[in-house]
């Protein structure tokens, strides 16, 4: 899980989700997991 100020989709399979006001990106590739901090 990477914590970044700006989160972007890295590949086509990345999906953007908003969970209680945090933007989270989940993907089949575990290296692409991100959340906004």
Swiss-Prot record:
GO terms for molecular function: structural constituent of ribosome. Pfam families: Ribosomal_L36. Signal peptide: none annotated. One of its GO terms (cellular component) is chloroplast. InterPro entries: Ribosomal_bL36, Ribosomal_bL36_sp. It comes from the Eukaryota. It is found in: Plastid, Chloroplast. GO terms for biological process: translation. Transmembrane segments: none annotated. Belongs to the bacterial ribosomal protein bL36 family. This is Large ribosomal subunit protein bL36c.
């Amino acid at each position: 899980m990477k914590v970044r100020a700006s989160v972007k989709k890295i590949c086509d399979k990345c999906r953007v989700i908003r969970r209680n006001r945090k933007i989270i990106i989940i993907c089949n590739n575990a290296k692409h997991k991100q959340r906004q901090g």
